[in-house]
Regions:
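Short, well-ordered beta-strand segments in beta-rich or mixed alpha/beta enzyme
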Residues: 21-26, 61-92
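Intrinsically disordered, low-complexity regulatory regions enriched in serine/threonine/proline
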Residues: 117-130
Length: 130
């Protein structure tokens, strides 16, 4: 798995302090339409399964598409009490939805979500508070 950037920060949401894990994943050339179809399924036919999956992991996921001159990126944030633990727990799951999700990620990004990301998570360097 190629992780271009990750960060863990603390954010306040409804006066509850939560951790946030942010990750960026490149979309290989020619795969953006397939990725958009995957996102449409998560927002449509598989919305309930997706919500239940993230709820059972104790996280809220937000996913963004970023177009750059170098290619498209997926930006993913996980918010919760322990998003890094949720990411590790997700990699171990074998229920039908999770297997399908991992297969989609593998086909689009060429990443194996069963294996942990290479290397340690980076250190947070700067946090801006209002």
């Amino acid at each position: 798995m190629t992780v271009l950037w990750t960060d863990e920060v603390t954010v306040t949401h409804k006066e509850h302090v939560m951790a946030m894990l942010a990750m960026a994943f490149p979309i290989p050339a020619g795969k953006t339409d397939q990725w958009k179809k995957f996102m449409s399924e998560l927002a449509g036919a598989r919305k309930a399964e997706f919500a239940a999956s993230r709820r059972s992991l104790g996280v809220r996921e937000r996913t963004f598409l970023q177009h750059t001159p170098q290619g498209d990126l997926v930006l993913v944030t996980l918010e919760g009490d322990h998003p890094e633990t949720a990411f590790a727990e997700f990699s171990k799951r074998t229920d039908p939805f999770t297997v399908w999700f991992k297969q989609q990620v593998s086909e689009i990004h060429g990443m194996d979500l069963i294996a942990p990301p290479p290397g340690p998570m980076p250190q947070q360097l700067i946090v801006s508070h209002s």
